[in-house]
């Protein structure tokens, strides 16, 4: 996991599925070290990417991982504000957007789908329960509910 600032995901530290946690001071070598075991089947989770920015030294390695995992079970999960996504035309977010796969939590309107080249109905944008999201894939979109650990 790449966590550039405090995150609720820190609770997962110590879980056997988490290979490690990297912060703002980490570099591409640190990430490569964590990925050396099973690259194609490892998911990199990047929380608050808008804090990390496109200029961080780890980003080329993260982009490389997105491309390496196209035909495997691994990948990259990037969490970022929807407003910030619109202005990122290069780097990790742009590469991830090309997959046309994503999850938009509490979408504000049909235009939010355009970030993934998806057309959403105009009815999207009303109040939704916490954890409600639109899952977008190359085959379309569907409403999903993100489960809450109790």
Which role fits each region the language model picked out?
Residues 1-97:
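P-loop NTPase catalytic phosphate-binding loop
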Residues 12, 41-42, 79-80, 87-150:
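Phosphate-binding and hydrolysis-coupling loops of NTP-dependent motor/remodeling domains
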């Amino acid at each position: 996991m790449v966590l550039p600032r405090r995150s609720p995901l820190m609770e997962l530290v110590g879980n056997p599925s988490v290979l490690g946690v990297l912060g703002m001071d980490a570099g591409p070598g640190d990430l490569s070290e964590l990925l050396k075991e099973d690259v194609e089947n490892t998911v990199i989770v990047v929380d608050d990417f808008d804090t990390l920015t496109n200029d961080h030294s780890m980003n080329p390695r993260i982009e490389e991982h997105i491309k390496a995992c196209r035909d495997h079970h691994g990948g990259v999960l990037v969490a970022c504000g929807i407003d910030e996504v619109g202005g990122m035309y290069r780097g990790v977010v742009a590469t991830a957007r090309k997959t046309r796969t994503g999850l938009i939590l509490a979408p504000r309107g049909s235009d939010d789908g355009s970030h993934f080249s998806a057309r959403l109905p105009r009815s999207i944008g009303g109040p939704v329960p916490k954890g409600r999201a639109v899952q977008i894939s190359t085959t379309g979109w569907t409403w999903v509910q993100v489960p809450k650990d109790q």
